[in-house]
């Protein structure tokens, strides 16, 4: 299922590229004119268990949780469709249980590939608790064409790629672009074989990320195999 593949992508990036992903998403948010409540802390201390063992939610898993250096917690939750009241109440109850378990402030960031104009952004849990995540990042709000052009220029000029460049190559197909996502993925895979200045960690993350994005957006098996072969990093 597409949702499961997108979910796996976000969780994997959160686990193996945590601080870079966190900083990248914060940088995306700053590109808009919207005013957001600042996060109390932006430095990750360690990964926290995603499993909640409680009488109400025994064995249920959150997508990803970080313990921050100020002892607060960042909770990532990903949804592939338009956000619904059910999505928000589900996430809000996770936060309530996580706060009960840790006794610490919980700040939730929802990442959505849905339509921001057709999504709910707050909900009531019960009759007295209004729930609004501190961040809802709708990837479709952010323009991707210029980002792709910028990374392409760096690759063609044999420039060293940053962590943000690597994440751009993975996330651009989910952003707002003038062409469809399948065409964007194919173009990106054509570029990456030309990359030479890249670290071992970046190579692993990019290879893994493109493996999933090609599977998400390319439906024809023969085309998928061809594109994956084309995207082999040197």
Walk through the language-model features, giving the residues of each.
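Elongated, amphipathic alpha-helical interaction scaffolds
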Residues: 1-234
């Amino acid at each position: 299922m597409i949702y499961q593949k997108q979910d796996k992508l976000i969780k994997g990036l959160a686990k193996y590229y945590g601080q870079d992903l966190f900083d990248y998403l914060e940088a995306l948010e700053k590109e808009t004119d919207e005013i957001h409540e600042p996060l109390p802390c932006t430095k990750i201390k360690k990964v926290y268990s995603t499993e909640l063992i409680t009488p109400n939610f025994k064995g249920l898993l959150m997508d990803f949780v970080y313990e921050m250096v100020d002892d607060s917690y960042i909770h990532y939750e990903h949804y592939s469709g338009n956000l619904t009241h059910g999505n928000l109440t589900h996430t809000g109850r996770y936060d309530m249980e996580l706060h009960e378990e840790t006794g610490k402030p919980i700040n939730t960031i929802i990442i959505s590939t849905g339509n921001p104009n057709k999504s709910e952004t707050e909900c009531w849990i019960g009759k007295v608790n209004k729930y609004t995540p501190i961040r809802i990042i709708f990837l479709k709000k952010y323009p991707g064409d210029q980002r792709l052009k910028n990374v392409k220029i760096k690759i063609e000029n044999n420039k060293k790629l940053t962590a943000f460049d690597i994440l751009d190559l993975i996330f651009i197909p989910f952003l707002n672009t003038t062409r469809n996502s399948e065409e964007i993925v194919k173009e990106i895979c054509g570029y990456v074989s030309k990359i030479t200045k890249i670290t071992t960690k970046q190579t692993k993350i990019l290879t893994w990320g493109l493996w999933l994005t090609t599977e998400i957006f390319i439906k024809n098996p023969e085309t998928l195999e061809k594109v994956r072969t084309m995207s082999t990093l040197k």
